[in-house]
Amino acid sequence: MNRSFVSIVIVQIASLFGDAVLRFALPLYVLNVTGSAALMGAVSAAAWLPYLVLTPIGGVAADRVNKRRIMAALDTLLALTCAAFLALDGTVDLVGLCICALIVLYAAQSVYQPTVQAAVPFVAPREGIVRATAIVSQISALSGLVGPVIGGLVFGLFGIEPVVAVAGAAFAVSAVLIVCVVRIPFQRAERSQGVLRMVAGDIAESFAFLRGERPVILKTILLVAGINLTLSAFIIIGAPVTVTQILGLPNQFMGFAEGALALGGLTGGILVGVLAKRLTLRQAPVFLFVAAVALLPIAVVLGAPLDPLVAYGVLVASLFVCMACATMFSIQGISFIQLETPAHLVGKVIALAMSLANCAQPVGQLVYGGLFDALRGNLVPVALGTAAAALVIAALTNRVLKRGLTAEGTAVDAVEVSESGALPVAVEPSEAVELPVAVESVQARMR
């Protein structure tokens, strides 16, 4: 790989590290200070809204605006946001301050990551684009693994201020490197219409294709939104509440739990690559079934009088399995979209798929935040109800795929795995990346 690509990789590492640390620490800080799962859910949900709105616009901007300037401006904005947080912490409302910081963070990343992805073809040789894209994607996954672990350790030992300071320094270093080192060729594109009108046209064209020619894809995306409403939101809100409040463990343990989620995502991606020739799209719902069943041990943790460390081990194992299975389903789903969508629509359809699949995430976080507060003394029904809902959605997905693939006569059976992403099942406060089954930093995948 050439020097230009290496320089982009270095600045991406710095920026995504700061992003992952903050996405983990700020909602947990709200939970620690207020003790309210509902407030933590509200903070996380509010932060998601600009991400959902700006992601399609970010894709258009990445194609039409100087990519180097976008990256430098966003990292500078994030560094200044961290500085403002440190200056205002303790003097203004905590929840409002965290919401503002996370909104800026999510909004920036909705534009930053598409810009990095769009820069790859300009700085990597044609024969190395697939490899370069895979490297960029793996850096994102690794940041979700390392960031929460380090963030949890620093937050648990020293509090929120050093965490924000470290993240701000990472953003500042990234901005300086972009200005001094990164070089991305840029040719100004002619624009016949405004960005918003262009985005609206892309969405309309993509939706018309899905509804008219590939309804099986549209139905599957909506079912993934259901998974994000239930299973993903349960994990995002339930994991930190369970670890820090119900089990009474230090914040460092929550960092390791988030690391387990990220490791599950990496493991799922590796397994799909290894088993690619044996997996078919018709088998994909099996992974959703397994993810749903993996919630049952969490019900035991919430209801049985187990030793905290034993309960923590069961919880971490369950989170790992959930994320691995969600990622495997996501990768198969996004590969199916790539194969079944005309080349000129692929990017637009994937962007629409990610927005639709993630749109239920904020609603789920609000609902589960309220449930964990209202039913703090008896959370077993919440876990069992979530598992039951996920099993029903998995069964519906199985039915939709079997009927849809047969009815539409698609030639896709064994799905060739793409190295560039997955359909987001969102499981992360750190991030979503595939057909998003969201287990957002607890990692955003269908993602």
Write out the residue ranges for each language-model feature:
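Primarily residues marking transmembrane-helix entry/exit sites
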Residues: 1-9, 37, 95, 99, ...
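Substrate-agnostic recognition of the 12-TM MFS/MFS-like secondary transporter fold
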Residues: 7-23, 47-60, 66-78, 97-156, ...
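Small-residue hotspots at the loop-to-helix junctions and early N-terminal turns
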Residues: 22-25, 29, 34-41, 134, ...
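A single, central transmembrane helix in multi-pass transporters
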Residues: 24-25, 158-165, 208-271
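Membrane-helix boundary and inter-helical linker elements of multi-pass secondary transporters
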Residues: 32-33, 63-64, 90-91, 122, ...
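C-terminal transmembrane bundle of multi-pass solute transporters/carriers
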Residues: 53, 57, 70, 84, ...
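Hydrophobic alpha-helical transmembrane segments
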Residues: 95-106, 128-189, 259, 313, ...
